[in-house]
């Protein structure tokens, strides 16, 4: 019986190495489970003791299913099961109505069209937009508000003028985003703080940004 087990072509069944970069974590998990089942069926099933089967199973798990791969597969599985937050992509008039309701039309002398134009050229109307700068700071939300001064990414010794976490600026209801944007426009630069507004919106006819929108 021992000699028969030694002749079992276990290695030939699993010709693809586990470390292959083209195989994902979940696929490796499936390969691990199928390899164990195949090897056990080749060993003769009922002619092998339960203790022997268990020992072989443990050996196969150690050989073909390293702990790191098992953990990766588990993380992938959990990420599929847990609910994910959906990014909110606003329409032009939809965003104009929301910003109008928050009181941005005419705030600090800027029209509603200024704000809609700004949102388009900073984030493309994406409330969950997140961009990383070379210095490690982040631009957050529909107005791409930066973490160097206005919000907190838990980086020590960094101002947090808006007194909120940067993740709050990714909320699709835009309340925190509008509060922070109002504080920014209270600065001497106003909307000029945003380079996108200076290049694409300032001094231009912006009526098209709110044209046809009902409030």
Swiss-Prot record:
<protein>
    <recommendedName>
        <fullName>Sperm acrosome membrane-associated protein 3</fullName>
    </recommendedName>
</protein>
<dbReference type="GO" id="GO:0036126">
    <property type="term" value="C:sperm flagellum"/>
</dbReference>
<dbReference type="InterPro" id="IPR019799">
    <property type="entry name" value="Glyco_hydro_22_CS"/>
</dbReference>
<keyword id="KW-1133">Transmembrane helix</keyword>
<keyword id="KW-1015">Disulfide bond</keyword>
<dbReference type="GO" id="GO:0003796">
    <property type="term" value="F:lysozyme activity"/>
</dbReference>
<feature type="disulfide bond">
    <location>
        <begin position="117"/>
        <end position="201"/>
    </location>
</feature>
<keyword id="KW-0812">Transmembrane</keyword>
<dbReference type="InterPro" id="IPR001916">
    <property type="entry name" value="Glyco_hydro_22"/>
</dbReference>
<feature type="topological domain" description="Cytoplasmic">
    <location>
        <begin position="1"/>
        <end position="63"/>
    </location>
</feature>
<comment type="subunit">
    <text>Interacts with ASTL.</text>
</comment>
<feature type="transmembrane region" description="Helical; Signal-anchor for type II membrane protein">
    <location>
        <begin position="64"/>
        <end position="84"/>
    </location>
</feature>
<comment type="function">
    <text>Sperm surface membrane protein that may be involved in sperm-egg plasma membrane adhesion and fusion during fertilization. It could be a potential receptor for the egg oligosaccharide residue N-acetylglucosamine, which is present in the extracellular matrix over the egg plasma membrane. The processed form has no detectable bacteriolytic activity in vitro.</text>
</comment>
<dbReference type="GO" id="GO:0001669">
    <property type="term" value="C:acrosomal vesicle"/>
</dbReference>
<keyword id="KW-0735">Signal-anchor</keyword>
<dbReference type="GO" id="GO:0007342">
    <property type="term" value="P:fusion of sperm to egg plasma membrane involved in single fertilization"/>
</dbReference>
<dbReference type="InterPro" id="IPR000974">
    <property type="entry name" value="Glyco_hydro_22_lys"/>
</dbReference>
<feature type="disulfide bond">
    <location>
        <begin position="151"/>
        <end position="166"/>
    </location>
</feature>
<keyword id="KW-0968">Cytoplasmic vesicle</keyword>
<feature type="disulfide bond">
    <location>
        <begin position="162"/>
        <end position="180"/>
    </location>
</feature>
<keyword id="KW-0472">Membrane</keyword>
<comment type="similarity">
    <text>Belongs to the glycosyl hydrolase 22 family.</text>
</comment>
<dbReference type="GO" id="GO:0002080">
    <property type="term" value="C:acrosomal membrane"/>
</dbReference>
<feature type="domain" description="C-type lysozyme">
    <location>
        <begin position="88"/>
        <end position="215"/>
    </location>
</feature>
<feature type="disulfide bond">
    <location>
        <begin position="93"/>
        <end position="213"/>
    </location>
</feature>
<feature type="topological domain" description="Extracellular">
    <location>
        <begin position="85"/>
        <end position="215"/>
    </location>
</feature>
<feature type="site" description="Cleavage; to produce processed form">
    <location>
        <begin position="87"/>
        <end position="88"/>
    </location>
</feature>
<dbReference type="Pfam" id="PF00062">
    <property type="entry name" value="Lys"/>
</dbReference>
<dbReference type="InterPro" id="IPR023346">
    <property type="entry name" value="Lysozyme-like_dom_sf"/>
</dbReference>
């Amino acid at each position: 019986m021992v000699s028969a087990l030694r002749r079992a072509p276990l290695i030939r069944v699993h010709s693809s190495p586990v470390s292959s970069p083209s195989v994902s974590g979940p696929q490796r998990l499936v390969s691990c489970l199928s390899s164990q089942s195949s090897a056990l069926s080749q060993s003769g099933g009922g002619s092998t003791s339960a203790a022997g089967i268990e020992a072989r199973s443990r050996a196969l798990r150690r050989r073909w299913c390293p702990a790191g791969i098992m953990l990766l597969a588990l993380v992938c599985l959990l990420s599929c099961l847990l609910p994910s937050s959906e990014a909110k992509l606003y329409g032009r008039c939809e965003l104009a109505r929301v910003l109008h309701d928050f009181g941005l039309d005419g705030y600090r002398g800027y029209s509603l069209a200024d704000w809609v134009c700004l949102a388009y050229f900073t984030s493309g109307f994406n409330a969950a937009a997140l961009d990383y700068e070379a210095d490690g700071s982040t631009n957050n939300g529909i107005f791409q508000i930066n973490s160097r001064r206005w919000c907190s990414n838990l980086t020590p010794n960094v101002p947090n003028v808006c007194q909120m976490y940067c993740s709050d600026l990714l909320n699709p209801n835009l309340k925190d985003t509008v509060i922070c944007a109002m504080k920014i426009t209270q600065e001497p630069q106003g909307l000029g703080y945003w380079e996108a507004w200076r290049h694409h919106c300032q001094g231009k006819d912006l009526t098209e940004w709110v044209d046809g929108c009902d409030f």
